[in-house]
Regions:
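Fe(II)/2-oxoglutarate oxygenase catalytic core
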Residues: 1-154, 159-168
């Protein structure tokens, strides 16, 4: 697991993220972007993906074979104790959601997991709870707990390690 605090240095991008009232409108909705090698970033979320994975990645993703790296599955999640949003995110592994849904009823569902995943906290918040818990030693062992913090990026093998968000 890699944790980077104060990840985004571009103040204008941080301000845009903070001020965008629509950023969390589609809570939990599946979204896909093929990456800058297929189309330019058109949304703030796609620009954020570029900032994390293309401009500042510790890996040289633009040189990866496009067959291996086909794009970015992403979604936003907002958790709170109010009734408008869920208060937790249950334990799960990340997977190619579209491929899973397309094959679940075939009798031979295909489970394809990502090489790596990330969690980024784009806005300032004052919450109790909401820890990202990563079960790197298995779901029955003690998890690693990471607090939600503005401008914090967490990178981990999200398809291999079960993870969840604790109650807010």
């Amino acid at each position: 697991m890699i944790i980077v605090d104060d990840f985004i240095k571009d103040e204008s991008l941080l301000n845009e993220l903070q001020d965008d009232q629509s950023f969390f409108n589609e809570n939990g909705k599946y979204m896909w972007w093929g990456g800058p090698w297929t189309s330019p970033a058109e949304s703030l979320k796609e620009r954020l993906i570029e900032e994390i994975w293309i401009r500042n990645s510790p890996w040289d993703f633009p040189r990866y074979n496009p067959i291996t790296l086909t794009g970015f599955e992403y979604w936003t999640g907002r958790y709170s104790p109010d009734t408008q949003h869920p208060s937790t995110l249950d334990m799960h592994l990340d997977k190619d959601e579209k491929l899973w849904q397309d094959t679940i009823n075939t009798g031979a569902p295909i489970l394809s997991i990502p090489i790596i995943g990330s969690v980024f906290y784009p806005i300032e918040m004052d919450i109790d709870g909401g820890y990202l818990e990563i079960f790197s030693n298995g779901p029955d062992k003690q998890p690693e707990r990471v607090a939600a913090k503005h401008n914090r990026l967490i990178i981990f093998p999200a398809g291999e390690h079960p993870h969840r968000v604790t109650e807010v």
